[in-house]
Amino acid sequence: MHYFVLASDYDGTLATDGQVHDETIAALERLKDSGRKLILVTGRELEDLLRVFPKVDLFDCIVAENGALLYWPSSREEKLLGERPPEEFVKILRDRNVNPLSVGRVIVATWHPNETTVIQAIQELGLELQVIFNKGAVMVLPSGVNKAAGLKAALDELKISPHNVVGVGDAENDHAFLNLCECSVAVANALPVVKERADFVTNNRRGAGVVELIDRLIASDLEELATQIKRHDILLGSQEDGSEVNIKPFGTSILLAGTSGGGKSTLAT
């Protein structure tokens, strides 16, 4: 088994209108029974997720608030990966009638067209904050906090390499964590730019697309995709005709032969 972690977005990927269908839950259970791990990577605040999705115990870890919070369902432990923006920032948004406005443990979120007011407040206060878009959602987070950073923190605690992870998502805020994963998958309803960058696009939409992916993952470990996933290949050099020679970063054995001092150690490192 090469891929033993599935990292999935929630809204628009696992869930339709905030709800996960029974068929999708059954597929997640099959994946767990295969010996693999599940990580949920979502922009939702944890309390909101727990309210709409009672099956969080299926997941080994939840990356919430777009990468700002780790939650371990088995122990109910939480770990913050950033600091909430100052209260003065939140006060300005409220004084300027930004609505809706949600303030999580770290994330501050609203919706289009409030991004102009949000950016103006950041500039006025001289804050080092970033604005991340998720379709109509506008999320404010500390610099460097995103779904990729959150997923990497979860994988580090699990002692698992991103090379062993399949990621699936649908929206622009999924780009970072999908790029981290060895294999990136877009569900059929994903934004065109997400599909363009994905290694594989499912035939089905939302939860049905995740079911499709899980069935393929269990059946073949996605071996049929190995030759088309080249994003993480390592360049060794070029042949006489100028064509590149690349190898996979895993599962490849190479014999280095030559005289002492010929550069074998340099090439290997």
Spans of model-derived segments:
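Short loop/turn elements that form and flank the Walker-type P-loop nucleotide-binding site
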Residues: 1-2, 34-35, 249-251
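Conserved acidic, metal-coordinating active-site core of Asp-based
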Residues: 86-181, 189
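Active-site T/S-Asp motif of two-component receiver
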Residues: 7-8
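Mg2+-dependent phosphoryl-transfer enzymes with acidic/Ser/Thr/Gly-rich catalytic loops
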Residues: 1-3, 21, 148-230
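Active-site phosphate-binding/coordination module
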Residues: 17, 22-103
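Short, structured coil segments at secondary-structure junctions
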Residues: 55-58, 65-66, 125, 180-181, ...
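Glycine-rich phosphate-binding loop of nucleotide-binding enzymes
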Residues: 231-269
